[in-house]
């Protein structure tokens, strides 16, 4: 069994990098070049000729030396030429237009505004221009009525050109939501009419006032970083979870990164991954809203703690189904070059059918993370190599899974509770992890005992050396998982029994 999970060794027969040699004809060509016979000029020789040089002896010798070296590297034949890559065409400039008396005034991008306005001669005065209709743009979904200035404003303080510049900056911002206007509200209503949350197109998610079309049915969880609510569209039937992230980071690039992440996550189609429907922002509150699949069975953390209050514990059979589902979800992500990086009981969810799925994963890490307890941006479930700042792979998720299952089985977090505080330094946590020995103890007084294969599974997950830790796909072949796959467990009945005593629950 040990050989099955041992990382494969290198199959290379030559451990050293082979020495590369030039062909004979290139060597002869290099020798002739070193003798001063420069038949072809190197592409770098002209680049290194500075326009500020005084043709000194040192500059000439340096250029000659670089030419000979570059000829040795690039001059494969006397007729070979190096083609320059074509320069991509520039982006079309932003054009703002206004018509008055049949004349259309066009203004290019912000880099040319000052020059264009200095050369602009029209037959209307500044105040006549201000008293005219608001400027219209060819950009869709942008309200530019704010460009119209107050007549009492001095021309030198906030002039018409500077107002156009602000309009250009607004139109090129990284926001994904269109500003609120009557036309946009009508357009948004048309886009969502007769559709449910999982049927909305990308254009509908670009409207920040989409939240006005959402009805909140209850609060699923709250924290300092945001909240999760049970929701439904006003004209829809499908219940979904709406996650609100309160962030003070209004950087467009930061929000673009999250949007790219969610767009990528929407493409995932797996029975073990929570489905993402869409995302929109509220610029006034700097909040990010993420709509995702509703999981009525709640999180694994809430489940095992609820049973613990009632004097119960999750059985090994149920833990086996949880481990299998998580490993299959991680394997699916691994096939798409994605590392979850935040496996813990709060991010493993169950629905009312007993299906187990993963949520809250992405490239931005803490940008879309859960509301769980973290310290200085580092999770208690983080693998040793990540805390040390070393390169890590998908096996870091296996470590987190082992720690999660150990917590669920034991009914408490595996580390000694008296040593854990929210403000613990990373070096102290690393010391605890490296000196930590997993202990899955039997509890005869509660009639709880664990199999040897389950203990072995935990041991492999918690290998401190990442090179000895198996991948999720390899862990699916562990004898304990293989044995659990053969056992039938009614997970729907388990979820119903777990929460049957809740009368006012959501």
Swiss-Prot record:
Gene Ontology terms for molecular function: ATP binding; MAP kinase kinase activity; protein serine kinase activity; protein serine/threonine kinase activity; protein tyrosine kinase activity
GO cellular component: cellular bud neck; cellular bud tip; cytoplasm; cytosol; mating projection tip
EC number, UniProt record: 2.7.12.2
InterPro entries: Kinase-like_dom_sf, Prot_kinase_dom, Protein_kinase_ATP_BS, Ser/Thr_kinase_AS
Active site: 342
Residues annotated to bind ATP: 220-228, 243
Catalysis: reaction(s): L-seryl-[protein] + ATP = O-phospho-L-seryl-[protein] + ADP + H(+); L-threonyl-[protein] + ATP = O-phospho-L-threonyl-[protein] + ADP + H(+); L-tyrosyl-[protein] + ATP = O-phospho-L-tyrosyl-[protein] + ADP + H(+)
Further details from the record: Present with 1950 molecules/cell in log phase SD medium.
Annotated protein name in UniProt: MAP kinase kinase MKK2/SSP33
